[in-house]
Amino acid sequence: IDMLEETYLKIISSKTAALFAASTKVGAILSESESREKDALDFYGKNIGLTFQIADDTLDYNSEIKFFGKEVGKDFFEGKITLPIILLCQKINSSEKEKIFSFFKQTNRSNYDLTFTLNLIKKYNIINECYKKADHFINLASNSLSIFENSEQKTILKNLTSFSLERNF
């Protein structure tokens, strides 16, 4: 469970972010856009993908929005190490860390284990920390669109940047 944030970002870059990047770049390729436009849309898609995945992983630990359809704790029960757990382990004291590590060493985690973890996430303000990280990628995505002239398409892409972080499902 001692995963670095950098390792986590590499993993989601090669999965979700790569899919988003391919999806945004293909339009530029098909329309025979300039190389710099293809690169900008590739960069945009990658950063939207990173934002989307961080938001999705954060939703798993946000008990405030469990009624939106995403089961709180799913990643936890599957033993997935995601950004909320990584950031939590950077902030907690040694006895709390020992307890969290013990949860992830087990094959089965209990509701008590999840509740304990959620309480620490709340105590250390980890949800906000995750959204700050995601916001960084939103800004990168949004800034990559600056090479394009104002248009309806650009407005749609800019709106998508906000949606990727603000979604609750």
Where are these regions (language model features)?
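All-alpha prenyltransferase/terpene-synthase fold signal
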Residues: 1-169
